[in-house]
């Protein structure tokens, strides 16, 4: 069994626990070096990075023939997705507010850390929302159907060609919708 298979095997809830653990560890470790607000932002960034890495490993390594079953495993509930969206929006707003509040007297390394944390938080939050929605779209597309009905799906999206969609198709759709809705 490949290492990627082991990493991609946990369902969405186990991934969430791993990401929460990473966020808590980073928060307490960074408190020794950073102010509370910066430690909170670094903690959120660690959480988001773990979720993004694990989700994108799934997106990039899941063969199309197993996506139907994997989509059932990787789906988060609608309530949890709503909570994700609200928390990521708050994290991004907090990061922007944090950037705006920087004192002009702050220079050098402190300003660079401040700026990097802020920019990374916005990028990670934005990417996290669309990645989670891409996984949700795959679940909604295939519905709760079983392997016996390989060519049947709940639908809702139409993909060009005869090839059944894979995770990357749903991620592409999610990011395109996300970018066009933000304009």
What label would you give each PLM region?
Residues 1-9:
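Short, Lys/Arg-rich, polar N-terminal cytosolic tail immediately upstream
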Residues 9-31:
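The first (N-terminal) embedded transmembrane alpha-helix
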Residues 36-53:
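Loop-to-helix transition at the N-terminal end of transmembrane alpha-helices
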Residues 67-87:
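Juxtamembrane helix-capping/reentrant segments at transmembrane boundaries
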Residues 89-109, 174-183:
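Alpha-helical transmembrane segments and their membrane-interface junctions
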Residues 103-126, 183:
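Hydrophobic alpha-helical transmembrane segments and immediately flanking/interface helices
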Residues 123-148:
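Transmembrane alpha-helix/helix-exit interface in multi-pass inner-membrane proteins
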Residues 141, 147-183:
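Membrane-proximal soluble regions of multi-pass membrane proteins
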């Amino acid at each position: 069994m490949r290492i990627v298979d082991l990493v991609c095997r946990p369902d969405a809830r186990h991934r969430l626990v791993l990401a929460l653990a990473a966020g808590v560890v980073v928060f307490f470790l960074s408190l020794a070096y950073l102010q509370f607000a910066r430690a909170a932002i670094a903690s959120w960034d660690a959480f988001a990075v773990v979720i993004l890495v694990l989700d994108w490993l799934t997106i990039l390594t899941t063969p199309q023939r197993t996506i139907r079953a994997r989509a059932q495993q990787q789906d988060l509930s609608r309530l949890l997705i709503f909570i994700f969206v609200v928390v990521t929006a708050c994290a991004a707003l907090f990061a922007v507010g944090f950037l705006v509040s920087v004192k002009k007297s702050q220079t050098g390394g402190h300003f660079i850390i401040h700026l990097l944390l802020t920019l990374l938080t916005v990028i990670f939050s934005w990417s996290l929302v669309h990645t989670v929605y891409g996984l949700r779209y795959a679940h909604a597309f295939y519905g709760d159907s079983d392997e016996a009905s390989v060519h049947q799906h709940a639908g809702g999206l139409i993909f060009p060609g005869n090839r059944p969609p894979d995770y990357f198709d749903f991620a592409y759709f999610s990011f395109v919708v996300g970018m066009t809705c933000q304009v």
